[in-house]
From Swiss-Prot:
<keyword id="KW-0479">Metal-binding</keyword>
<feature type="binding site">
    <location>
        <position position="168"/>
    </location>
    <ligand>
        <name>Na(+)</name>
    </ligand>
</feature>
<dbReference type="InterPro" id="IPR023333">
    <property type="entry name" value="Proteasome_suB-type"/>
</dbReference>
<keyword id="KW-0378">Hydrolase</keyword>
<dbReference type="InterPro" id="IPR001353">
    <property type="entry name" value="Proteasome_sua/b"/>
</dbReference>
<keyword id="KW-0963">Cytoplasm</keyword>
<dbReference type="GO" id="GO:0004298">
    <property type="term" value="F:threonine-type endopeptidase activity"/>
</dbReference>
<protein>
    <recommendedName>
        <fullName>ATP-dependent protease subunit HslV</fullName>
        <ecNumber>3.4.25.2</ecNumber>
    </recommendedName>
</protein>
<dbReference type="InterPro" id="IPR029055">
    <property type="entry name" value="Ntn_hydrolases_N"/>
</dbReference>
<feature type="binding site">
    <location>
        <position position="171"/>
    </location>
    <ligand>
        <name>Na(+)</name>
    </ligand>
</feature>
<feature type="binding site">
    <location>
        <position position="165"/>
    </location>
    <ligand>
        <name>Na(+)</name>
    </ligand>
</feature>
<comment type="subunit">
    <text>A double ring-shaped homohexamer of HslV is capped on each side by a ring-shaped HslU homohexamer. The assembly of the HslU/HslV complex is dependent on binding of ATP.</text>
</comment>
<feature type="active site">
    <location>
        <position position="5"/>
    </location>
</feature>
<keyword id="KW-0346">Stress response</keyword>
<keyword id="KW-0915">Sodium</keyword>
<keyword id="KW-0645">Protease</keyword>
<comment type="function">
    <text>Protease subunit of a proteasome-like degradation complex believed to be a general protein degrading machinery.</text>
</comment>
Amino acid sequence: MFEATTILGYRGEMGGKKFALIGGDGQVTLGNCVVKANATKIRSLYHNQVLSGFAGSTADAFSLFDMFERILESKKGDLFKSVVDFSKEWRKDKYLRRLEAMMIVLNLDHIFILSGTGDVLEAEDNKIAAIGSGGNYALSAARALDHFAHLEPRKLVEESLKIAGDLCIYTNTNIKILEL
């Protein structure tokens, strides 16, 4: 099974302007071997109004992306309503309950983690969320940099993912970032 990655979502306001970014590394691991170093695990959805990223089984993640994107379209881009309906649908479907993937979805106002059990978790501060094998490293770095360093949002995401890549053997520093 393909696994291991780090995805970091970051949203907030700087200088009176809202921002939302998502970043991820490019490493794909199969067992104890790196099989790809430049994979893309982040996407822009609904006319570039929502960002998303996944960690876990690649095939499962694409199933989740497709399902979430369909619901997001039906809710006309309303992220909050979409994650609630996504969770309801996920829990009803026996196949989906076995998927081994997690997602972060965010826009300028909200950031959520969608877990492999169908749970929807809003980030504690509605600002920073991370998933994957290096997620805790990236989350810790992002919180510290957000609190003390006062970096531009893109630089904060990049530096946090670099720290995760230096610490987690399943995460590299081939970083891709999308922003709204």
